[in-house]
């Protein structure tokens, strides 16, 4: 029988481990749980790409719950859907590396799922904030816009970075890949903004305490700042 240790041994090289450890919540919580969730898929004909497509379902369900069930229970269920996406986002890569069937298109599909999660998660919190918030002076439509912009701020510098890597093709542009060259500030930014990391923890806390507006405004400011600094690094 395949065990968690078997999956970890076949899917986590020393180099990948060093990079993955920089995202603390994803490495110490999300990744071990993704190993457990990978086991049922090992002896099936389900492909990694199919898992990536499957991961879009909880994202859509979570957004639907946020829109249609504007209660604490509905928002907690939505968060569970987003967390399930987080785990499935690890399963597709685990499955690909375990079976040795990684492909360039698999990376594209995985990125598509990740971009969808980034935008939907922050948008959903903007919607949630328009229903339940700690302070009454925010206009609901402001919070919706801030949530949508926050999601866009996370995605936009990544698109510019990938264009720079594929177009400029200098040594400096290639160093933008991965996390190997991350300094302390970049590691902190990664932990605070990676949608598979601490934002999910802060999201749950905000939902439980009714601080959806504080989450939305705070991440609008943080993601905007990180976007500006990231673009400055790419375009210098």
Predicted features and spans:
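A feature for the membrane-embedded catalytic helix bundles of lipid/isoprenoid biosynthetic enzymes
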Residues: 2-38, 111-236
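Short, contiguous, helix-prone interaction/anchoring segments in small proteins
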Residues: 32-52
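Alpha-helical transmembrane segments of multipass membrane proteins
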Residues: 39-40, 60-67, 201-205
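A generic hydrophobic-helix recognition signal that picks specific residues
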Residues: 40, 82-85, 103, 147, ...
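Membrane-interface alpha-helices at helix entry/exit sites of multi-pass transporters
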Residues: 104-112
